[in-house]
Amino acid sequence: MTIKRNCCNANLLYNNFIGEKMRNIVGPPVSGEDFWDREEVIELIGNSLKKQSVLLSAPRRFGKTSIMRKIYENSMDYLPIFIDVEGLERPEEFISILISEVYKRNKNLKDNFLKNIGIKILERIDKIDIWKLRISLKENLKENWFELGRELFKTLKISEKPILFLIDEIPLMIRNIKDKEIAKSFLHWLRGLRQMPEISEKTRWVFGSSIGFNYVIKNVGTTSEVINDLKTIRIAEFERSQAEDFIKKLIDEEIEIKDLDSSIIDGLLHKVGTPIPFFLQVIINELINLVKGGRFLSPDLIKDAYDQMLSPWNRSYFEHYYERLAIYYEPQMARVVKKMLSLIAKKDTVNETELLELFRREIEGKEDEDTFSLILSDLENDFYVVKRDTYYQFSTKLLKDWWNRYYG
C-alpha cells in the first residue's frame, strides 16, 4: 500500500492553533498552549512528505524540537514515532529503539512482528515488556545490524497506517559513533531504507539537525549523496510581522497590556537585531521581570533589560553557542573556529581572505579550503554569522555583544 496523498496533507499534521494562554518558557521545547504558531513551516513539512522525507535544520533553541513534537502530537493519518538520538553511539541502539517504539504504538503488529528473521525472543514476545524487547533486539543486532536491521524494517509493511519517524539530532548521533567506517555505513544504510520500495511505501522520515550536517558527513569520509534524497527545510528567524505578533502576545499574557506601544516593539527589535524567537523570549523575560519589580515599561527600560540579559548571572542563556563548537568539531578545529568568531566579534566585519589566512595559519596546512568553506557555511547555517558581499559579521548584535564580553 502506498502512502495516500491526503495522509501527508499539512492540515492533518497540524491543527492551526494558538493557545488562549501562552507562557514565555525560555529554553526547553514547548507544546500545547505554549507552542507559538509556525504554521508555514509545518505546512511546508506536510507538503514535502507527500513526495519525500525531510531534513529539518535549525540552530539550537529555534523551535525545531517543538515543531517536531507538535507534528507528533497532531499526526492523524500517520503512526508517529519521535526519538531524540543525540546520546546514541551505535546503529543497533538506533534500530532497537525505533522498532520497539513501533511495536509499543502498534499492537496489531505483534502477531507478525520479527517473524522468520532468527531472533530467539519471538516465542515469548507476548510476555516481554518493551524495555526487555529493546535490550534483546540490541543484543541480537550487535553482530549484523546492517542486514538484520533492514529485515526488521521490512516487517513494518503490514502496518495499517504509514509510519512517520521523527528523529531529532541525527548529526550528533553520527558524530558520536567512534568508528568512522561504521558511521559511514550507517548513513548509507539509512539512505537505503528510504530508497527500498517495500520500506519507503510505508514510511516517511523527518530528521532534525541543530548543527551543519555536511561537515559531519565529510568528517566520516563520505559525501552529501547520503542525504541528497531529503528535502531540506530550514527554520528561519521571524518575519517582521511575526515578531511583532510574538512580542505583543508574550507581553500581554505576562503583564496584560493589550495595546502595546509601537515604540516598545521597535525598541526590542532594534536591540535584538535579527528577530530570532529565542533571543526575543530572553529579552522579553528580562523586561517583564523589571516591570514586575516596579519599573515603568518604556523604551529606556529596554536598555536595562538588554544589560541584564548579558549579565554574568544570565550567561547560561547563550553559553551553548560556545560549548556546542567543542561537541561539533574536533578539538583543534573547535579552537580555530572560536578564534575566527572572536576576530569577527572584535572587528565587527572581517573579509573572507583574512579569515582564510587565520585558518591556514592555525591549521598549518592540515585541512584544505573545502573544509574552510564548509565551516563558514555551517556558521552561517547555525546563525553565528552572516555574509555581506565578501565580508562576514555576526548575525545578531546580541550574540556579538555576548561573545565579545565573555570570549572576545
Where are the regions a protein language model picked out?
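The catalytic "switch" region of P-loop NTPases
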Residues: F17, K161-I163, L172-K271, F278, ...
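Winged-helix-like regulatory helical subdomains adjacent to P-loop NTPase cores
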Residues: K271-E367
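A short, conserved structural fragment
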Residues: E380-D389
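Accessory beta->alpha helical hairpin/"wing" motif in late/C-terminal subdomains of nucleic-acid enzymes
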Residues: R388-W402
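P-loop NTPase nucleotide-binding core
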Residues: Q52-F62, S66-K180, T203, E369-D370
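Walker A/P-loop-proximal flanking segment of P-loop NTPase domains
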Residues: N6-N74
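Alpha-helical DNA-recognition elements
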Residues: N74, E286, D378-N381
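Short amphipathic alpha-helical interaction segments
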Residues: I363-N381
